UniProtKB/Swiss-Prot annotation:
Cofactor note: Binds 1 Mg(2+) ion per subunit.
Named cofactor requirement(s): Mg(2+); Zn(2+)
Entry's Gene Ontology BP terms: DNA-templated transcription
Organism: Hahella chejuensis (strain KCTC 2396)
Protein name: DNA-directed RNA polymerase subunit beta'
Described function: DNA-dependent RNA polymerase catalyzes the transcription of DNA into RNA using the four ribonucleoside triphosphates as substrates.
Family: Belongs to the RNA polymerase beta' chain family.
Keyword Cell cycle: no
Length: 1396
């Protein structure tokens, strides 16, 4: 008997495997899988319900219908296992073999597999070098193809129409062989000599010049090599045997009423079998050619429909006009095998219910309804009942549970003790959407949730539902407790800030108790300690908000856990003293001695976590919550209509605005303004008015007059409930209060344009019908937007997860010294993100020196920068640091811990095995729903603000000039003549506090290192013209300047001054078309001047449309403006904002009219112009080849003739193209660009995301390289391969002293990068399943199952987290097997034996 059971176990024993390979199945292979041929289209006998013999459900082929019982019933029971019944031919076996046994159909005529024919690029077409059109004409019997020309003038592979074929027959007889249909194609494929073809192509590629041809040839070469290497035969793409899916995977289910529900596949198979059998008969009968041909074509079409319905021609539909679901449809799409069943499975031991608030719970608890718990923990209860001897069998235990006997509840209590359950709320946008809690049994049917975890779940109690899952095994319980317990997830993985932060009522309560109220009961009392305050408050001798003096005992704990106690009498309020009583030891009183707004509480919890650790913080968070709820109740804050105080100034402000608008309307009427200008001005006026009203309103709400104890009237912060709620951050914002008590303001039309007339009323006054109608627009658009946004944001997250899913921390340190240079993010005069925030939790890549002393190492390389180190850096005035980054990490698969730095959710160096890719994707995708969907139109205010014409310093400090090329004027001022210069102001410590770009032609009134005071103007320029500036002085001579031919004189009507304008070549008379007007400088002797240190004569070309007022022979000083090019005020461009912008950046889309960058460094000159384009030539200084580029005439250039540019400098402005940045400026600059652009979008919405998440995604976007030349490696020129693979090849080549391959990094968008991953399982489960699988099969791809997705699909532990240990162990064992035992191991084993 024991053997039997072992046998049973062995039947479904899964082999351990390390990789999966898919390839084409040969006909013999298909036959070897099969258990018999399906010959009839019948399914089951409708009377007996037994499967028909040789039909699609035949028991003889596929196995018995009942367990261990043959069809006729002769053999039953286990003892006959393996017997084949002589009567019905059925093997006695378990019924589940019907899920795995396949059959086959022998096709009477070969049929092309549609995937290899129609999935682009067509593999069959590539191999035969024919167009898809031609192949289809052969396959679907429209024309003949020559297979063997014999001794005729025909060529192999030539197509012949019917007439041509019969003509050829008459001419040559049966000397040649031409056929049609799949057998013809099969013959051609079988005749291919792959090796010879590959040789021929390899020789041909270097000898062709046309790019397109090389591309085509290398595509063919790649495919041929793939076939040759993988052992696939090309003719296997044509099917001669068709496999039949096991019947239980395409079931036939009897419905009540004698009808059957069937899988579509059965219909499709029936079609194939019917046509196949008919074709066989026709062939036996030697039917006329035309009938056989038609039948063959129909067979081809039916097989096409079975494999991929609708790919060619019209989809075959069922009885209800619905296209039938083919084999391809089964695996692709959201409802396909991959996404429905392999990546998302339903799980047992789970339940869901509505959530309600559980204000009395501790942070690690959740309330679980008894009924649910009983159902979820059933198996545990059964086993306990049996174990205790309370029930004899499982069945008895089941009965007890169903009767809900008293003892069952006691046992449930025991079972549940310390058995965590997982709570999940959909949508799970980040990993905090599933957390573990200890259940507390409650009455009722709703799950109780702790209020503090609502932020993480994004849950509210308006009817949200949550799901409960039970971790069953000990390991699962352990992981749930150690990794997923809500108490272990206090910090957000996106930015490292606490996510367990009180909100709403709790904030309101804490804010209320920490406010001061003037002249409250007990003001001015002095207390010896907090206990005394409590007694006084309890005895009602003192109010909660009274100002008092209290003696406070402050404890400070330093790094080494040493305590320092300071005792001092401080001014505070009763509420603050009471709140300080629940603080853990080690937190300063200053943290609470303020109005506790939401921000202050967040800072408090952060400080608590950093100073006193996790355990104390969790207890503290709970205490804070209970306290907050208690005092919120006491405060009695509620709002009524009268709390919305309308400011008295409102009417005045609105009147003034209306008068301004009238003024502008009259200007418009008299033609002084265009429609657009009027619109912008009006909208500006109303936005300003709205701001004024809301400021007046907040001032009015925020202050109230009270009498102090001296009897004087003073202002104090108001206790108006509305103001309290907004100011504390509990609920509502100034913008919302503005609509309630100020004015509603401007509204947008559905198309996004703003309506000129604002709604001047607010909700308290009430809207009239017109105002209400206008406001409905906005409200509806808001709802429509939200729905769209959710879908788009979810899709972005999905693409991000897919591109980064296989990035895991695999190593402690890769040892690289590369990194990214991080600087503070400064916009104009404001530090938006200080350096400390950007480098916190990163590892330094090189020694950091202090700003004042270049020898003094502040922080050595390889240090993890924590809060204290960052403070040291701030003090030392460091303003740029090279930190390690995932982008520059050199680990082969994955990233090393040092390059990643701190695990934001845990606050220490990241653990090996952390799935940083998925975390990064979630952190970027989760706030996606908060981003806007709209494109901003720059109107009014913004377009005028852009015309800045000077730089005014905000802070005093030292001037630093970066990348400056300048010349000095006579008056000592510097004039900037480079384009990428910048001016920064550094403070005493040497940190840069302000940073400004300097345009060309700016006049600076300061020098490098000069001290300036706040408010000083350091630079001026004319924003409306672009100057041309001389770099040497001399006498001006004009060349090619002829009035009416190349230039025309303009006289300004108002000032009477005259200007000479250079005419556009297209407006010049024919004689002046090719003349290029220029200005030459001569020295005092009348000789040509040269630029200092060169042989280049000093010539300034005057571009078209430039204006100048010099005369021939004028003397020119250094730094004079010789001509000005008027700048058209830049047209208002729409700025794509929000979610679409983030998607564009991650998809690496090229912008419409990107900025043009210099490809090489050198001197600029202009060549011959073509129609509509300028030819710009850059000549390098080191005599290499010059570089030419054609630029459309309308593009404004930033460079002049003779100017020198650096590689990657902007020649013509526009939105940056990330591909250019990578190519010309390298990975570092690209990373910086993408990080800053994405952070700008998120920062606008107030979302904080750590840079490293974006870096992780960027790493995945640049992991491919283009091979520029193959050297002596096996790579093909023009191929795209993984960087890792290329570096491995080059390493090999280096060891053998061969030529390495040259390459160029490429940037792929996230969708492309996901599909270009090494793992075909991951790619197929993402998008374009058919294409991915076709390619993988043809090339015989092997999937090494390195990523997370692949392992989920094959049902293994993922190689991340606790699963990474399992995978490492397996890898180690495999190495040992392959490499045998090493000598060291033997020695170790021996010594171990001897030491026993």
């Amino acid at each position: 008997m024991k053997d039997l059971l072992n046998l049973l176990k062995n039947q479904n024993y899964a082999h351990e495997f390390d990789s999966i390979r898919i390839s084409l199945a040969s006909p013999d292979m298909i036959r070897s899988w099969s258990f018999g041929e399906v010959k009839k289209p019948e399914t089951i006998n409708y009377r007996t319900f037994k499967p028909e013999r040789d039909g699609l459900f035949c028991a003889k082929i596929f196995g018995p219908i009942k367990d261990y019982e043959c069809l006729c019933g002769k053999y039953k029971r286990l003892k006959h296992r393996g017997v084949i019944c002589e009567k019905c031919g059925v093997e006695v076996a378990p019924a589940n073999v019907r899920r795995e046994r396949m059959g086959h159909i022998e096709l009477a005529s070969p049929v092309a597999h549609i995937w290899f024919l129609k999935s682009l690029p067509s593999r069959i077409g590539l191999l035969l070098d024919m167009t898809l059109r031609d192949i289809e004409r052969v396959l679907y019997f429209e024309s003949f193809i020559v297979i063997d020309p014999g001794m005729t003038t025909l060529e192999k592979g030539q197509l012949l129409s019917d007439e041509q074929y019969y003509e050829a027959l008459e001419e040559f007889g049966d000397e040649f062989d031409a056929r049609m249909g799949a057998e013809a194609i099969q013959g051609l494929l079988a005749d291919l000599e792959l090796e010879d073809e590959i040789e021929r192509l390899r020789e041909e590629i270097p000898n062709t010049n046309s790019e397109t041809k090389i591309k085509k040839l290398s595509k063919r070469l790649k495919l041929m090599e793939a076939f040759a290497e993988s052992g696939n035969h090309p003719e296997w793409m044509i099917l001669t045997v068709l496999p039949v899916l096991p019947p239980d995977l395409r079931p036939l289910v009897p419905l009540d009423g004698g009808r059957f529900a069937t899988s579509d596949l059965n219909d499709l198979y029936r079609r194939v079998i019917n046509r196949n059998n008919r074709l066989k008969r026709l062939l036996e009968l030697n039917a006329p050619d035309i009938i056989v041909r038609n039948e063959k074509r129909m067979l081809q079409e039916s097989v096409d429909a079975l494999l991929d319905n609708g790919r060619r021609g019209r989809a075959i539909t069922g009885s209800n006009k619905r296209p039938l679901k083919s084999l391809a449809d089964m695996i692709k799409g959201k409802q396909g095998r991959f996404r429905q069943n392999l990546l998302g499975k339903r799980v047992d031991y789970s339940g869901r219910s509505v959530i309600v608030v559980g204000p009395t719970l501790r942070l690690h608890q959740c309330g679980l309804p008894k009924k649910m718990a009983l159902e979820l923990f059933k198996p545990f209860i059964f086993s306990k009942l049996e174990h205790r001897g309370l029930a004899t069998t499982i069945k008895a235990a089941k009965k007890m549970v169903e009767r809900e006997e008293a003892v069952v509840w006691d046992i449930l209590d025991e079972v549940i003790r310390e058995h965590p359950v997982m709570l999940n709320r959909a949508p799970t946008l980040h990993r905090l959407g599933i957390q573990a809690f200890e259940p507390v049994l409650i009455e009722g049917k709703a799950i109780q949730l702790h209020p503090l975890v609502c932020t993480a779940y994004n849950a509210d109690f308006d009817g949200d539902q949550m799901a409960v899952h039970v971790p069953l095994t000990l390991e699962a319980q352990l992981e749930a407790r150690a990794l997923m317990m809500s108490t272990n997830n206090i910090l957000s993985p996106a930015n490292g800030d606490p996510i367990i932060v009180p909100s709403q009522d709790v904030v309101l309560g804490l804010y209320f108790m920490t406010r001061e109220r003037i002249n409250a009961k007990g003001e001015g009392m002095v207390f010896s300690d907090i206990k005394e305050v409590q007694r006084a408050y309890g005895a009602k001798k003192v109010d909660l908000q009274a100002k008092v003096k209290v003696r406070i005992r402050d404890v400070v704990i330093d790094e080494d856990r040493n305590k320092t106690v300071t005792v001092s009498v401080l001014d505070t309020t009763v509420g603050r003293a009471l709140l300080f009583d629940i603080f853990p030891e080690g937190l300063a009183f200053s943290l609470v001695n303020q109005n506790m707004t939401k921000k202050a509480i967040s800072r408090l919890i952060n400080a608590c976590y950093r100073r006193v650790g996790l355990k104390e913080t969790v207890i503290f968070a709970d205490q804070i919550m209970y306290t907050g709820f208690y005092y919120a109740t006491l405060s009695g804050a509620s709002i009524g209509v009268n709390d919305f105080v309308i400011p008295d100034e409102k009417a005045k402000i609105i009147d003034a605005a209306e008068n301004e608008v009238k003024e502008i309307e009259s200007q418009f009427a008299s033609g002084l303004l265009t429609q657009g200008e009027k619109y912008n001005k009006v909208i500006d006026i109303w936005s300003r008015a709205n701001d004024k009203v809301s400021k007046a309103m907040m001032d009015r709400l925020g202050k109230e007059k009270v009498v102090n104890k001296d009897g004087k009237e003073v202002d104090q912060d108001s206790f108006n409930s509305v103001y309290i709620m907004a100011d504390s951050g509990a609920r509502g914002s100034a913008a919302q209060i503005r609509q309630l008590a100020g004015m509603r303001g401007l509204m947008a039309k559905p198309d996004g344009s703003i309506i000129e007339t604002p709604i001047t009323a607010n909700f308290r006054e009430g809207l009239n019908v017109l105002q209400y109608f206008i406001s409905t627009h906005g409200a509806r658009k808001g709802l429509a937007d939200t729905a769209l946004k959710t879908a788009n944001s979810g899709y972005l997250t999905r693409r991000l997860v897919d591109v980064a899913q296989d990035l895991v921390v695999t190593d402690l340190d890769c040892g690289t010294s590369e990194g990214l240079l991080v600087t503070p993010h400064i916009e104009g005069g404001d530090v938006v993100v200080p350096l400390g925030d950007r480098v916190l939790g990163r590892v330094t890549a090189s020694d950091v020196y202090s700003a004042s002393d270049n020898q003094n190492v502040v922080v050595p390389a390889g240090t993890l920068l924590d809060e204290t180190t960052v403070e040291t850096l701030e003090k030392a005035g460091v303003d740029e640091i090279l930190v390690r980054s995932p982008i520059t990490c050199e680990t082969k698969y994955g990233v090393c811990a040092s390059c990643y730095g701190r695990d934001l959710a845990r606050g220490h160096l990241v653990n090996v095995g952390e799935a940083i890719g998925v975390i990064a994707a979630q952190s970027i995708g989760e706030p996606g729903t908060q981003l806007t969907m709209r494109t901003f139109h720059i109107g009014g205010a913004a377009s005028r603000a852009s015309a800045v014409d000077n730089i005014q310093v905000k802070h005093g400090g030292t001037v630093r000039l970066h990348n400056l090329k300048h010349i000095e004027r006579k008056n000592g001022n510097l004039v900037v003549v480079s384009r990428s210069s910048a001016l920064a102001i550094a403070d005493e410590a040497g940190r840069e506090r302000e940073w400004y770009k300097l345009p060309y032609g700016v006049e600076l009134s300061v020098k490098q290192g000069q001290q300036v005071a706040a408010g000083e103007i350091v630079a001026k320029w004319d924003p409306h013209t672009h100057p041309i500036i001389t770099e040497v002085g001399g006498k001006a001579i004009f060349v090619g300047v002829e009035e009416g031919i190349t230039v025309k004189t303009q006289t300004d009507e108002i000032t009477g001054l005259s200007n000479i304008e250079v005419m556009d070549p297209k407006d010049r008379p024919a004689s002046g078309k090719d003349i290029r007007p220029m200005l030459q400088l001569l020295d005092a002797n009348g000789k040509e001047m040269k630029f200092p240190g060169t042989d280049t004569p000093v010539q300034y070309f005057l571009p078209p449309n430039s204006l100048f007022s010099l005369k021939n022979g004028d003397t020119i000083e250094v730094g004079d403006v010789i001509a000005r090019i008027p700048q058209e005020s830049s047209k208002t461009r729409d700025i794509t904002g929000g979610l679409p912008r983030v998607a564009d950046l991650f998809e690496a889309r090229k912008p419409k009219e990107p900025s043009i960058l210099a490809e090489i460094s050198g001197i600029v000159s202009f060549g011959k112009e073509t129609k509509g384009k300028k030819r710009l030539v850059i000549t390098p200084t080191d005599n290499t080849d010059p570089f030419e580029i054609l630029i459309p005439k309308w593009r404004q250039l930033n460079v002049f003739e003779g100017e020198s540019v650096e590689k990657g400098e902007v020649i013509s402005d526009g939105p940056s193209n990330p591909h250019d940045i990578l190519r010309l400026l390298g990975v570092g600059e690209l990373a910086k660009y993408i990080i800053n652009e994405i952070q700008d979008v998120y920062r606008l919405q107030g979302v904080v995301i750590n840079d490293k998440h974006i870096e992780v995604i960027v790493r995945q976007m640049i992991r491919k390289v283009d091979v520029l030349s193959s050297g002596d490696t096996t790579l093909i020129k023009g191929d795209q391969v993984e960087l890792v693979k290329l570096l491995e090849e080059n390493e090999k080549a280096g060891e053998e002293a061969k030529m390495p391959a040259r390459y160029e990094r490429v940037l792929l968008g996230i969708t492309k990068a996901s599909l270009a991953t090494e793992s075909f399982i991951s790619a197929a489960s993402f998008q374009e399943t058919t294409r991915v699988l076709t390619e993988a099969a043809v090339t015989g791809k092997q999937d090494h199952l390195r990523g997370l997705k692949e392992n989920v699909v094959v049902g293994r532990l993922i190689p991340a987290g606790t699963g990474s240990a399992y995978h490492q162990e397996r890898r180690r064992k495999r190495m040992q097997k392959e490499g045998g035992v090493s000598a060291a191991d033997v020695v170790q084993a021996l010594s171990a034996e001897l030491n026993k």
